[in-house]
Curated annotation (Swiss-Prot):
InterPro entries: Calycin (IPR012674), Lipocalin_ApoD (IPR022271), Lipocalin_CS (IPR022272), Lipocln_cytosolic_FA-bd_dom (IPR000566), Retinol-bd/Purpurin (IPR002449). This is Retinol-binding protein 4-B. Its main location: secreted. The keyword Secreted applies. The lineage of its organism: Eukaryota, Metazoa, Chordata, Craniata, Vertebrata. Belongs to the calycin superfamily. Lipocalin family. It is found in: Secreted. RBP delivers retinol from the liver stores to the peripheral tissues. In plasma, the RBP-retinol complex interacts with transthyretin, this prevents its loss by filtration through the kidney glomeruli. The gene is rbp4b. It comes from Oncorhynchus mykiss. It comes from the Eukaryota. The modification N-acetylserine is found at residue 1.
């Protein structure tokens, strides 16, 4: 891979209805700035007109030391590529971030794993200057061994290999 954002391959023939439901983030590559720390669970839905929406929650620390469960919302705008969306997102509370990000589905088998990618800022040389990525699993316990290799190959293609951190699931957001 030459690390050019414009050359990144996304999921072919992406099926949004099979992508719906609950996904547990098992690893993430952080962007610059405030971001969900762990206990990240995303839920994707498709309405009657085919529009994609999502909710996500995860643990954050704000004001330096206040730990809380953040509830985030997103609406997805279609692009000519079915696996590439423009996502408008906001938090349930005013001090949580809001904005617009790309939301690309790089690969998924719909039943076990999914790889998400978002570049917030492309550098002058065409590589990603500020971006983030989630590795999702349908299972809170993590990826199956047979999915690990696929995911590692995709991390390389995204030029994010070695930049991911494990996302733990401790039940923090279920209790709060």
């Amino acid at each position: 891979s030459d690390c050019q954002v414009s050359n990144i391959q996304v999921m072919q023939n992406f099926d949004r209805s099979r992508y719906t439901g609950r996904w547990y983030a098992v690893a993430k590559k952080d962007p610059v700035g405030l971001f969900l720390l762990d206990n990240v669970v995303a839920q994707f839905s498709v309405d009657g007109s085919g529009k994609v929406t999502a909710t996500a929650q995860g643990r954050v620390i704000i004001l330096n030391n206040w730990e809380m469960c953040a509830n985030m919302f997103g609406t997805f705008e279609d692009t000519p590529d079915p696996a590439k969306f423009k996502m408008r997102y906001w938090g349930a509370a005013a001090y949580l971030q809001s904005g617009n990000d790309d939301h690309w589905v790089i690969d998924t088998d719909y039943d076990n794993y999914a790889i998400h990618y978002s570049c917030r800022e492309v550098d002058l040389d065409g590589t990603c200057l500020d971006g983030y990525s989630f590795i999702f699993s349908r299972h809170p316990t993590g990826l199956r061994p047979e999915d690990q290799k696929i995911v590692t190959d995709k991390k390389k293609e995204l030029c994010f290999l070695g930049k991911y951190r494990r996302v733990s699931h401790t039940g923090f957001c279920e209790s709060s």
